[in-house]
A protein has these predicted regions:
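A short alpha->loop->secondary-structure connector
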Residues: 1-7
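Short, charged/polar "capping" segments at the starts of alpha-helices
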Residues: 16-20
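Catalytic beta/alpha-barrel core
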Residues: 7-12, 30-32
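Alpha-helix C-cap/termination motif
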Residues: 1, 51-52, 73
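Donor/substrate-binding cores of folate-linked one-carbon enzymes
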Residues: 11-14, 24, 41, 56-172
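Conserved beta-strand segments of alpha/beta enzyme cores
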Residues: 6, 27-29, 77
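Adenosine-nucleotide cofactor-binding segment
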Residues: 22-54
């Protein structure tokens, strides 16, 4: 089913999704990180986010590490979708990492961000089976549906106040 949610805005650090987002009458803002420190970029990003006062912030295709000040400003409100079954294959190119290891399952993880890369409290995960015939690209294509499902389920839990965070774990 559909999520009962209002997307207040999409904020990216590249302008490449503007046209797509604006087709849905959703405001798009580009807050470039070029020439800025992580702290400077985080401050500009937070200022733009705060204009909308969202309940939650979703990181999807946002491939930048956010600074501790940004993380502290939005505790347990920033949800990241990572395209692996964490804690396996942290960081960039997890499908390539999975392919190189010859895994038999791939997955996706939605988690709250913290100051450690891809190590925040896990909200939702799911996996699918793969085999030796899958290339890294085939894994990536197969994983897209898993990522969408995991993110939507995590958002549904968050929006219905069904997540309790204790230490670095969640109870849902």
């Amino acid at each position: 089913g559909a999520l009962d949610v209002e997307i207040a805005a999409v904020i990216g650090n590249h302008d490449n999704l503007r046209e797509l987002v604006e087709r849905f009458d959703i405001p798009f803002h580009c807050v470039s990180h070029e020439g800025l420190t992580r702290v400077e970029h985080g401050k500009l990003l937070a200022e733009k986010i705060d204009e909308y006062a969202p309940d939650y912030i979703v990181l999807a295709k946002y491939m930048r590490v956010l600074n501790p000040e940004f993380v502290a400003r939005y505790p347990n409100r920033v949800i990241n979708i990572h395209h692996s079954f964490l804690p396996a294959f942290i960081g960039a190119k997890p499908y390539q990492q999975a392919y190189e290891r010859g895994v038999k399952i791939i997955g996706a993880t939605a988690h709250f961000i913290n100051n450690e890369l891809d190590q925040g409290p896990i909200i939702m995960q799911n996996v699918i089976n793969v085999d030796h015939t899958y290339s890294a690209d085939a894994m990536m294509r197969a994983g897209r549906d898993v990522e969408k499902t995991v993110l939507s389920r995590a958002l549904d839990l968050a929006l219905h106040d069904r997540i309790f965070v204790y230490k670095n774990k969640t109870v849902v």
